[in-house]
């Protein structure tokens, strides 16, 4: 909807701006002046610029790869704006529906009366000046568009200078039309115009969220009520909306980070915006808090009216509900600002309320985010949003680390916090356990989240500050926090259990959310989660009791956590502090996303883990651990958040929420947890609680180890984990093992979960890979607990990965877990380079690699012999038979012979014409180990294995040798055509074959000047290989070679690959021979260009440079036929 609408908007905006003016001015002339739409249709029907349009369409098709129809539609939707059309097509914002509905009639309806239009225009202007719709839509680029939109769409009607007229219009027309269009009109106009063009980041959210919220609310049947509300609160709401816009803008950016397209899709498909939009309406005067709440409630239209009408009640009830529902929806919108959102979710009532009340660091955004957090958490949880994983992570950070949120509150809302707290207290506190429970349960990390909120409730300001101090204080602050959380946890736990229903509600939102996280979340869910579930199931969560115990266990755990904090403060504390403070700072400002997402995440990741461990240490940590595990993707983000919050668990919880793609887990931490993470709270709780005690006991022992967590704690934790975690062990075991570690583990697990599927190392391995990152060294070992032990290093990278919250994408770099198996030698990294290359790639590389001593010489002997006329056959003749030169010295017959022979094959090799050199078989079999090509540097035949490509490569390699190119052409073309070879050999035959392209080329030396270039071209034209061939190529061979070798890499001129000495300068050849692997790797890793450049240099000089590759060929070729090699051929 959004997409189509947005396009509508885009086009409509353009057209409408024209039309409204025209209509307003010419309302009487409406008939006279065709609507913009009509005009457009007429143009479409009769296109004077048909050629232009076709050109545009072609351009679009080329750029976007879409089919003609799509491109045409996009072009029409974009009013012929190719760039916009490209953006729309690439962004997946198809205006197809919008475009269809954009008809002038609706616009006409919008402009039913010229008076209305005029009034509307005036109103729009007024409002714009007033800073209402248009100004609010500043971000959307909306003043100009907005005016027309408002006028045409009656969007501004609710605002209205003419409330009655406007209201009627807006309601009747705007809403009616909106409804008629399925709110598409408003959405389309508000969101559509800018959305496709991305006029402004916050446009869709702002326009859609706020404006649309109102309209949608009206459309939702709250037309008049919401409209009235909108009218009454419109102004007040709008400004908050604006703030929200700011948030949303930031959020949108975040979302873009989270894959805005996905979200757009989800929102559009899910019509989350509908609820979302209505909530915008709900942005009532209550202030940012209300805005947030309204936004939160937006997702839940039912609660919207209530919330708007009585935000307080709404907040209390709606908070749970709205948060729950809103969470889902806002998760979508707010995901970007998830960090805060999550944290709100975590301790949704308190955090949310406070955050909402406080307005977070950035009141609108933060508030929104916080609420969103819960919403997001809900959403994340049920859907197990992967896109939000980062957001989730961030959210989890928030959740996990109210401190982050609190920090933000501290920074900004500290003062407001008291009120927020009171507000929270009346809402969150009374509601908190319910709401928090709901949220918590939904969020799986509720316990943690709840724990956190209690501290937050206790005093968000103080909490925030303590949390901030937690970074430094860690233990003491954590103790407070943890202890509070323990109390809260217990309360929450009880409340927590009731909350499942809320979770379910979010589930309905799940589809959009889950849609995004499918890969990230599902992977853990499907592979790890299943295994984990089994494990955890076996593990016995004792979920319910566990949770209850969890609270008490949390105390012990928290103590342990405190210990870990102390420990971490030692090792992680610094990072923790750094990240923590950072988190606090971030929290205060960007905290939601940025902290969670990366800086905090990365730096926090380690510290996060420890903080997570610390704060997670309380049962929630375990409960959420599983959740975190599930949320794995999110967890990484959350981890930092957790750290920041000092509630590792919270963060983990967040992760859990994210992970808790299994909505059930969210609902029921205990039962769901097992299913969701299995690691989940129950497992953690049960095992953890008991283990918590154990951990408490163990942790003390571990505590020392904790400092060394990486190694000894790992074993210790492993031990505890073993008993404790069982299969859950690694990731979850770690988690359970020590609350702190558990959290680290959880965080790791969360990360792992994020990567979990990716990091298949083990159920825990995934966690280890990603999850460990948070814990990094300490937790990493811990988390690795077994599976992830290796992950620690990886884990570090994982941290970064986690930071992104999309571990899998990041995995490749730092996380071998996913990929190392792919590499021949994942860990070694040596062979892996080769595995990187395919046969073709190797061929390509080889062509670039300095020619082996044998590589070209082989080609030279045969090729030169046959090519005598063309290239200096002397070197090759000599080379083949003798090691006359260093270059040809290698009896390079094997490899180069393939090439040379192929060249000759072109020439005389027609008979010979084995794609593989005769020597190839031995080389072939030996070279069968192309990766060991370096080994047989002396082995002439080794390279031949790839000779067939070699000939191609040789062409490329012996770029200097016209034969090479021709060989290639002939080798490929003529090889295919036996006659071709003969023809090539004979200038005439070649001429016949290639029409002088090859013949000339083959005999290029003879006809090189005349034919060389042309031949090269001809060859390329006539033969597939000609690119490489022809004087043109020889001349350009440095590049062509690269290109060719890339295109048709010489098979394996193993000499190059082998590093045989060969055409490369003899000295270079030895160097290469010794480091063939290196060369191949460098060629591949570095661009092939370096090697290529080698060759290129070698080749490009044709004489000297070429010498390296065809070395003997080239120099001699130059010598023998300076014309061909030097002037004509190379010049050509």
UniProtKB/Swiss-Prot annotation:
Domain UBA: 48-92
Compositional bias (Low complexity): 341-351, 436-448, 602-618, 631-644, 713-722, 897-914, 1101-1115
Region (Disordered): 1-29, 95-202, 221-248, 331-351, 380-479, 602-679, 713-749, 875-919, 996-1033, 1040-1059, 1087-1132
Pfam families named among the record's database cross-references: UBAP2-Lig (PF12478)
Top-level lineage group: Eukaryota
Biased composition (Basic residues): 168-182
Statement: the UniProt record of this protein carries the keyword Zinc-finger: no
Bias (Polar residues) ranges: 233-244, 331-340, 392-404, 619-630, 652-662, 723-742, 1116-1132
Main location: nucleus
The UniProt record lists the keyword Cytoplasm: yes
Transmembrane segments: none
InterPro entries: TC-DDR_regulator, UBA, UBA-like_sf, UBAP2/Lig
GO cellular component: chromosome; cytoplasm; nucleus
Signal peptide: none
Keywords: Chromosome, Cytoplasm, Methylation, Nucleus, Phosphoprotein
Modified residues (Phosphoserine): 433, 440, 631
Compartmental location: Nucleus; Chromosome; Cytoplasm
Modified residues (Omega-N-methylarginine): 166
Function, in words: Recruits the ubiquitination machinery to RNA polymerase II for polyubiquitination, removal and degradation, when the transcription-coupled nucleotide excision repair (TC-NER) machinery fails to resolve DNA damage. May promote the degradation of ANXA2.
Complex and partners: May interact with ANXA2.
Protein name: Ubiquitin-associated protein 2
Gene coding for it: Ubap2
